Amino acid sequence: MWCIVLFSLVAWVYAEPTMYGEILSPNYPQVYPNEVEKSWDIEVPAGYGIHLYFTHLDIELSENCSYDSVQIMSGGHEEGKLCGRRTNKNSNSPVVKEFHIPYSKLQVIFRSDFSNEERFTGFAAYYVAEDIDECTAFADAPCSHFCNNFLGGYFCSCPPEYFLHEDKKNCGVNCSGNVFTTMTGEVESPNYPSPYPESSRCDYQIQLEEGFRVVVTMRREDFDVEPADSEGHCPDSLLFVAGDQHFGPYCGNGFPGPLTIETQSSALNIIFQTDGSEQRKGWKFRYHGDPIPCPKEVTANSFWEPERAKYVFRDVVKITCVDGFEVVQGSVGSPSFYSTCQSNGKWSNSKLRCQPVDCGAPEPIQHGRVEDPESTLFGSITRYSCEMPYYSMECEGSEVYHCSGNGSWVNKVLGIEPPKCIAVCGTPSEPFRSTQRIFGGSIAKIENFPWQVFFSNPWAGGALIDEYWVLTAAHVVEGNDIPVMYVGSSSVVTSQLSNAQMLTAERVFIHPGWEVLDPSITRKNFDNDIALVRLRDPVKMGPKVAPICLPGTSSEYDPPENVLGLISGWGRTNVKSHVIKLRGAKLPVAPLSKCREMKGVNPGIDISSFVFTENMICAGNDKGVDSCDGDSGGAFAVQDPKENKPKFYVAGLVSWGPQCGTYGIYTRVKNYVDWIRKTMQEYSAPSVD
């Protein structure tokens, strides 16, 4: 058995890129063998196409060249498939079939089946590299704008103000980096209203002075950007970014956003992005700088000057706190402050607050107390009171104070002055009830005469009329500028005086009308026998120490005849020179003539030679009750005719008398009230050494 072995020849040929070449079927020009498949990979230098042409073609003919064929492939695409016999169509050219391939590579494949009824000689073909116009040879333009062909290739270029992307094919516009700093202006897309560039990103910035916000105004008809796709995404878009604020992205025919965009920033970024597809006319808008507003309310409980509906950058206002409120900076309070609307839309001094005025703790007072108020802020109330019953308010209605808007405690009567507690005058803690009418009077308690002052040298008396002042007779302190005085003791025994209040004189004021005589001359003129002693320290009042009232200046304080007055002291009695325990007595007022008619102890002294004036009061009787030596300067106390309750005023001061136990002369204090008050007022403050 003979086995016939058939073989097929399969060949693959590759060569370096060349500018031309020849391709021949197997055994050409002889009969090609059966069952052959051979391919040729043709490659010319990049940038060239291939011109392939056949000068001979003799291949078994079949439908669709399904038996034997020569096939031309380019990039997986069949450029042609040939079979049969071909002859040249032009006698001047040997070419029977040709192909112009715009690529630098192609493949030629020859196939034959297992038998041929005739002798076919195959094909002869040639190729040559030829320049192609890439700018027109392809359905898709290789360049987005300008295509430039050259031998073996091409390059893309762009219009002015455009640049070529890294792919060397697409153009973009260099539209980033533009910064607009004017207060008004217009911004538009590249080429507006001509189509904007594709595949671009434009970044613009509006940068205004701090304190001004960017406001954009757009007309709908000035906006035409490729519309959104079916999913709502914008292929081309315009976006505004101002800090944390984002407006957009916007796209479509006609601006879809608000026609006025008010940002809250002085800087606005405009981002315009396009893809590589559809381009439209783009957009334009205007902008301006609007001063950044500040909120109207800086702080509560205040009012502003000037009053405006709107406050903007650089506006300055004066903020004044309403009554009862103040601004506290450190430890200093002020009723107002200034604030400026700043570039960030906030007020300067915004941390300052109008807070209730704090009047602080009420001022303490002497001889009184003040309630601890629940609060010391504006509108709070506090009350003062005096140490009753020995002190009372100097002014009626001065007890209640309220914290006022100016930070002071204010009283309706006294204003900002604190109240003053003054000693209650003319009211003994124990009334003097003795009815004894004998020379020397009766023993008394100091509580009966709490105004009684004891002068130890000379032995005399005085009347306390104020915490700093003692009233006495001029002849008591004449030549004695620093008298030693005591109050608050019934007994003037040295051991008892240690429990009394010792008074230190600061200054002595003798009435200017008092006649100063040589001590060797017998005094017959006691007119103006009155003096004041200013104390260095205030006297503390109590049940044993209290002042007597001064008289008024009206005629009611001229005591009529037979009105009883009280006298007290440690003067001489009918049994001894001086007493050590306080004695008191009641004396009636008598006509001055009674004192003129009296005869003195010394028959050699003519009483009629003594001076009698209207500045004197005569009091006493012939029953042995009278003031005497050692009582000088003491008060002749009479009940105040204008008071319902017993209250005594100093009607007179013990001055002189012709004889103890009868009538005596008293200085009429009413006539000196003006001098007393003037002196006390002028020297009210203690002197400072």
UniProtKB/Swiss-Prot annotation:
Regulation: Cleaved and activated by C1R. Immunoglobulin-binding promotes autoactivation of C1R, which results in the cleavage of the Arg-Ile bond in the catalytic domain. Inhibited by C1 inhibitor (SERPING1).
Keyword match Heme: no
Keywords, sorted A to Z: Calcium, Complement pathway, Disulfide bond, EGF-like domain, Glycoprotein, Hydrolase, Hydroxylation, Immunity, Innate immunity, Metal-binding, Protease, Repeat, Secreted, Serine protease, Signal, Sushi
PTM annotation ((3R)-3-hydroxyasparagine): residues: N149
Record: residues binding Ca(2+) 1: E60, D68, D113
Primary localization: secreted
Keyword DNA damage set for record: no
Disulfide bridge map: C65-C83, C135-C147, C143-C156, C158-C171, C175-C202, C234-C251, C294-C341, C321-C354, C359-C403, C386-C421, C425-C549, C595-C618, C628-C660
SMART domains: CCP, CUB, EGF_CA, Tryp_SPc
Binding site for Ca(2+) 3: E226, D236, D275, Q279
Entry GO CC: extracellular space
Subcellular location: Secreted; Cell surface
Ranges where the Sushi domain occurs: 292-356, 357-423
Name of the featured protein: Complement C1s subcomponent
Family named by the database record: Belongs to the peptidase S1 family.
Species this protein is from: Bos taurus
Post-translational modification: Cleaved and activated by C1R to generate Complement C1s subcomponent heavy and light chains. The iron and 2-oxoglutarate dependent 3-hydroxylation of aspartate and asparagine is (R) stereospecific within EGF domains.
Site (Cleavage): R437, I438
Pfam family of the protein (one): Sushi
